[in-house]
Amino acid sequence: MFFRPCVHTVGRYSRARVPGLLSSLFFYRSCNNVLTNSLPTVTTAGRVSRYGYICRRSSTSAAERGVFLPFALTCRRNIHSIHEDEKKLERWKKIEESHPLDELVLDSVVKVFSNSTEYSKSKPWKTLDQKSSRGTGFAIAGRKILTNAHVVMAMNDHTFVDVKRHGSQIKYKAKVQKISHECDLAILEIDSDEFWKGMNPLELGDIPPLQEVVSVVGGENICITKGLVLRVETRIYDYSDSDLLSIQIDATINDENSGGPVIMGNKVVGVVYEIGFVIPTPIIKHFITSVQESRQYSCFGSLDLSYQSLENVQIRNHFKMSHEMTGILINKINSSSGAYKILRKDDIILAIDGVPIGNDEKVPFQNKRRIDFSYLVSMKKPGEKALVKVLRNGKEYEYNISLKPVKPNFTVQQFYNVPSYYIFGGFVFVPLTKTYLDSEHHQVKISERLADDINEGYQSLYGAQVEKVNGVEVKNLKHLCELIEECSTEDLRLEFKNHKVLVLNYESAKKATLQILERHKIKSVISKDICLPMLLDDPFKDNKINLLPWSVLPLMFDFS
């Protein structure tokens, strides 16, 4: 008589009573049953899980008779699954043999609470709903707390941050001293001596070797998980779209782990920033050094150009590269780049600071590893120079190029201070990209059209980038304001990067602007941070209010 095991069946499959470590997706195949030779061989997929026995109802007459085939008689594990389980056993053995964390390490880890109000991207004079965020941080030298930028979210007057020590119920007020959204890091200051009592700063270590065991610390009530280092490479940070060095680990990342330290041997080897990914210590040290040296908001250099690999021998021959030469081909150099008008399209970059670049766009790194060449540039600060060796028309040249800051894929005003804006004719002009906040050159775009008869028919200009005002190339938002305020022609003409044109009657647009401000309860045509020469004088001097520039008037009245 056939013995039918007692199992908990879910659908066509049941749960196997095997160790959780062996849980994995695999393929199994039924074999001829000892009770009947009529069963065919069928291949299907299943999952070994923690409870019960895996069984499969036969698709033939045995199924009609309700016969269940035990796992031992009907399934064979494939070789790949066995090897995978052996790797898992080795992994867990390595993790179990690792040393527990020192209690002093845990005492240096804190909980971070942040509440921030963002400004509207399209209407920068308006604030949006308050957002709350929680994460982890840890003490570093100088009575500072290091955490993720996305945990504190912003660095402005509308951001409020509290921290709480491990095992304590008291929250302490913190101030964001420095934030870098490029590398997703922020430094907090806490003035309370009580908070720092008995807290030791954690020491920063080096990049961990592959397959080394690391501990991830953070989350609610200090959760500790362990895993192995899988790879070290440059990677696009999702938060900022910056291409920087990163470490991938297989340790479980729990809720609110962001900003927590990754520990190896009681030293910090990284900061958690995404699920499975860690900011390595070279990036952390570079960020901290930049904080001490400068108040710049960007601390990573960039050549700001487009390029491609040269792995195909035909393209290398076309550009007269010798057999031993390797490098990358420049496709485009952006006008904001320090290499603009120095390097050229179709130049071959052979080396940076004496380090040869491979045809695969990579350079040598630690322990025979290779990473993207951008690492050489990003680990320099904006304003520093890089020695770039290029091949041009078969001849080699070297240039010292001043690096520009990395430009993340977001508008700076959202994160740092009260947004900059200027309104004219119902069009809202804002900075387009993140550079230095005091940069002499940045792009300007239209973020919103406040509907009015004066701007009817110009709906397609939303998001358009301004190139010229009355034939003069626009340098930045302040320059655009000056060009519009000082307009002496009957018509104001704006030209855009997409080749579209905006023409407004200047006097009519000025009158319409004041009406638009009152209609939308906007206090000013211009943000406070943009200081035009015409606004520096006392507007009530000699009571000559009628001689004031027209745009000063909204600054005197509160329409709310």
UniProtKB/Swiss-Prot annotation:
GO CC aspect terms: mitochondrial membrane
**GO biological process: what's one of them?**
proteolysis
Where does the UniProt annotation locate this protein?
A: Mitochondrion membrane
Any idea which GO molecular function terms this record carries? serine-type endopeptidase activity
EC number(s) given by UniProt: 3.4.21.-
Chain segment of the transit peptide: 1-65
Q: Where is this region: Serine protease?
A: 117-302
> What keywords is this UniProt entry annotated with?
Hydrolase, Membrane, Mitochondrion, Protease, Serine protease, Transit peptide
A Pfam family cross-referenced in the UniProt record is PDZ_2
Q: Which residues form the active site?
A: 150 (charge relay system), 184 (charge relay system), 258 (charge relay system)
Residue ranges of the PDZ domain? 288-384
Q: Which family does it belong to?
A: Belongs to the peptidase S1C family.
What does it do?
A: Putative serine protease.
PANTHER family attached to this UniProt entry = PROTEASE DO-LIKE 11, MITOCHONDRIAL-RELATED, PTHR45980
Q: What is the protein name for this chain?
A: Putative protease Do-like 11, mitochondrial
What organism is recorded for this protein? Arabidopsis thaliana (Mouse-ear cress)
Lineage in the entry? Eukaryota, Viridiplantae, Streptophyta, Embryophyta, Tracheophyta
State the encoding gene.
Answer: DEGP11
